[in-house]
Curated annotation (Swiss-Prot):
This is Kelch-like protein diablo. CDD domains: BACK_KLHL20, BTB_POZ_KLHL20_KLEIP. Pathway: Protein modification; protein ubiquitination. Kelch repeats lie at residues 292-338, 340-386, 387-433, 435-480, 482-527, 528-574. Residues 41-108 form the BTB domain. The keyword Repeat applies. The gene is dbo. Residues 1-22 are annotated as: Disordered. InterPro entries: BACK, BTB-kelch_protein, BTB/POZ_dom, Gal_Oxase/kelch_b-propeller, Kelch-typ_b-propeller, Kelch_1, SKP1/BTB/POZ_sf.
Length: 582
């Protein structure tokens, strides 16, 4: 026999690791065969007289409910036949089949019995499958039923999804029979949500009244309980008075009349609105509209004008709204507490100290605001810390450095520290808690100087000047910079523009506008910077242009109805009613 070759390396043990992928499937299949043949079964589940043979160990491995039953001290742990009540026998058989096969079919005919059974047996996977099935079945005609079903069986995720679906599709849901059959508690749960997707609060009121009139005899006792969740202060005045206030059911209930009176006070007392805020004055999120731009007064065709128009960027339309009671050129405009203030100006003959206030909810101007202590045109107006500031201007005799501020709570103006320089045609802006007065004219020549007011110290101090002298310029705060555009220097109308960085106390140029614009309005609307109207040295302008900071470019984007020089601009959120009166 030949020699046997022996390696010098130490021997390694022979080993092969194997995990069978077929084994679990084969084992379950064979266990199910045993069950079908009633072999080695040690328990019978009796549901409504139907006897289902099974193995305790399989049921316990799959269901915490059965595990607690068979491994604890319950009487069922010693029984060979266990009766389970309040569960559908077909659903139980499907679930026990699943324990042996890992397969189940959920369909419209069984989901309503399968989900409660899965909840009882604590089969989380089947609960999830049933909920997923119901999510896919959601539509405006059944979402309320599915929502109630989910709530009954504590299916939080399905309840959340059904709620979200109901809120998003409320305009269709309110037309369904399910809606008319809602218990009062579920109705309140739905209409109290901030997420309710409606075009206006009028739709919510109409839905509530349709629900009420479906069964007036039983439901009229709940009218006040339900109406307190309708946000009546957000209704249009016409609808509030003509529809809500005249409804016989509403008029016959004292608590409902109080809700209507509350809404009327909110609409009729705009200055008091900051003190009247609450759940009923909060707009629902889906109905919150974007910002709109107002162009107020100005000079056109050789005379001051009273006209006012507003621009909606979503539609790119300019529409006329109620005019002011007086013609005003060189008017100062600002928004305080969702109301638009027009301060001073010149009516073509006289310098003005009167103020008008516009309420977009009613499309009306009111003249009950206290006048400024001085007549002012070419005045700068801005809001800081809840006060309205009037800065500089001219009174027909001299250029002013006077500054005063308006307290809407007291309806009173009071003087604060004057500027260090007299300024007419001044632009003002608020940034970082300071009030900036930018450029203008001292009565002799245009200015490039800038000063800012600290309300904590009641003091003005100079900051870095602009690179260009500018009077009758436009300015606005955009992305934490102060932008100054257009105006007029010693010689001509300007198209140039620059911006101020408060962190470096420096000005830097940006690209010029497409047109020269003196007496231009500048405002930020929905995150975009708009330059409005003005005078180019030859003609009064009705064009507007918008600035893109990413490309550092201006582009024209439409025209106003009126040409405007020295008009004011203000930005407000559009009213929350479908039938607002613009």
């Amino acid at each position: 026999m030949g020699d046997v070759l022996i390696s010098d390396r130490p021997p390694s043990p022979a080993r092969l690791s194997h995990t069978s992928e077929k084994h679990p499937r084969v084992t379950l299949t064979e266990l199910n065969v045993l069950r079908r043949h009633r072999e080695l079964c040690d328990v019978v589940i009796n549901v409504s007289g139907r006897k289902i043979f099974a193995h305790r160990v399989i049921l316990s491995a799959c269901s915490p409910y059965f595990r607690a039953m068979f491994t604890g001290e319950l009487e069922e742990s010693r029984q060979t036949e266990v009766t389970i009540r309040d569960i559908d026998e077909n659903a139980m058989e499907l679930l026990i089949d699943f324990c042996y096969t890992s397969h189940i079919v959920v369909e419209e005919s069984n989901v309503q019995t399968l989900l409660p059974a899965a909840c009882l047996l604590q089969l989380a996977e089947i609960q999830d499958i049933c909920c997923e099935f119901l999510k896919r079945q959601l539509d405006p005609t059944n979402c309320l039923g599915i929502r109630a079903f989910a709530d009954t069986h504590s299916c939080r995720e399905l309840l959340r999804i059904a709620d979200k679906f109901t809120q998003h599709n409320f305009q269709e849901v309110m037309e369904s029979e399910e809606f008319l059959l809602l218990p009062v508690g579920q109705l309140v749960d739905i209409i109290c949500s901030d997420e309710l997707n409606v075009r206006s609060e009028e739709q919510v009121f109409n839905a509530v009244m349709a629900w009420l009139k479906y069964n007036v005899a039983e439901r009229r006792q709940h009218l006040a309980q339900v109406l307190q969740h309708v946000r009546m202060p957000l209704l249009s005045p016409k609808f509030l008075v003509g529809t809500v206030g005249s409804d016989l059911l509403v008029r016959s209930d004292e608590a409902c009349r109080d809700l209507v009176d509350e809404a009327k006070n909110y609409l009729l007392l705009p200055q008091e609105r900051p003190l009247m805020q609450g759940p009923r004055t909060r707009p629902r999120k889906p109905t919150r509209r974007g910002e709109v731009l107002f162009a107020v007064g100005g000079w056109c065709s050789g005379d001051a004008i009273a006209s006012v128009e507003r621009f909606d960027p979503e539609t790119a339309d300019w529409k006329m709204v109620a005019p002011m009671s007086k013609r005003r050129c060189g008017v100062g405009v600002a928004v305080l507490n969702d109301l638009l203030y027009a301060v001073g100006g010149h009516d073509g003959q006289s310098y003005l100290n009167s103020i008008e206030r516009y309420d977009p909810q009613t499309n009306q101007w009111s003249c009950d605001v206290a006048p400024t202590t001085s007549c002012r045109t070419s005045v700068g107006v801005a809001v800081l810390d809840g006060f309205l500031y009037a800065v500089g201007g001219q009174d027909g005799v001299q250029c002013l450095n006077h500054v005063e501020r308006y307290d809407p709570k007291e309806n009173k103006w009071s003087k604060v520290a004057p500027m260090t320089t007299r300024r007419l045609g001044v632009a003002v802006a608020v940034l970082g808690g300071y009030l900036y007065a930018i450029g203008g004219s001292d009565g002799q020549c245009p200015l490039n100087t800038v000063e800012r007011y600290d309300p904590r110290q009641n003091k003005w101090c100079a900051v870095s000047p602009m690179s260009t002298r500018r009077k009758h310029l436009g300015c606005a705060v955009f992305n934490n910079f102060i932008y100054a555009v257009g105006g007029r220097d010693d010689c001509m109308e300007l198209s140039s523009a620059e911006r101020y960085n408060p962190h470096t106390n420096s000005w830097s140029p940006i690209v010029a506008m497409t047109s020269r614009r003196s007496g231009v309005g500048l405002a930020v609307v929905n995150g975009q910077l708009y330059a409005v109207g003005g005078f180019d040295g030859t003609a009064y302008l009705k064009t507007i242009e918008v600035y893109d900071p990413e490309t550092n470019q201006w582009r024209l984007c439409g025209c106003m109805n009126y040409r405007r020089l020295g008009g004011g601009v203000g930005v407000m959120r559009a009213p929350q009613t479908e039938n607002y009166m613009w």
